[in-house]
Amino acid sequence: MSEDNLQMVVVQAQNCGVLHVYVQGNLEERGGKTIILTVHDIGTNHKSFVRFVNHPSMATVKEKAIFLHVCVPGQEDNSADFFGDFPTLDGIGDDLSAVLDKFEVKSAIAFGEGVGANIICRFAMGHPNRIMGIVLVHCTSTTAGIIEYCKEKVMNMRLENSIMSDGAWDYLLAHKFGGESKSRQEYLEELKATLNPKNLSKYLVAFTKRTDLSSTIGTKLETVDALLVTGSKASHLHTVYTTHKSMNKKKTTLLVVDNVADVMQEAPDKLARSLILLCKGCGVLSGVAIPGMERQRTLSSSMEEADRPRRMSVTQPHLPPVPSA
């Protein structure tokens, strides 16, 4: 994949030591542009967000925004082994303020996927004055349930030694794809070829040791505009509902995309549309058109009318079969 002329900036941070931030957009032309801060999921890195931003549905947003893609320590392509104590999710989240300080950004739209969404949540809860709005894709706000806990306990015995066992790879695939998917093997091969498995195991351990957010997320994010996103086939669908249940319904919108597990890959146009709506509600990207508005009712009214149901379900179209030659 093309690096899209990304600029990599090293940021000194208290908990992570250093963070590699990949800037997508021209910082020299930042006047009037919206800053969007991103944090990726386990089993990927900043490139997952670069792919999303490069999707045609994001073209107008890309012109009006600058993206700061934060790479979790040790998750860069072909990274050297990470030595020392790996930061907690709280620690990574707290260090995001150092990223904004480095770029002299007072506040930003914060956007996370999976574990990255959990990290964004922690950042927003600790630094609400640095946030204009948050986008949380497949966000888990609770600790592991009893069944998941038992599986994670066994898995951690090997992960603590920086070993990605077959069970750990299976867990990662289920986390990413939910059920069966034709993309699983392709994803696994790319993952093993690019990411350092020892470092990947450390990020995974940090996630399995996450602390609960659900009891305080509602009060700490009471004034923050939030968009929660999930696919109906996502493995953590129920935890997204739990997160939504804990949040201020007047400030939070839930988007459920039917028949997909990985929203960023399988339904980028739906995600882009909802991102634009959130940004408009936060007073930014006002000049950006909303793709597909003429074909589909969107979330704009639900952002203003707290009494209406907050769930928006989007069904992917069934494409006709390709005719044989």
From Swiss-Prot:
Residues 296-325 are annotated as: Disordered. GO terms for cellular component: cytoplasm. InterPro entries: AB_hydrolase_fold, NDRG. Pfam families: Ndr. GO terms for biological process: signal transduction. Belongs to the NDRG family. This is Uncharacterized protein ZK1073.1. It comes from Caenorhabditis elegans.
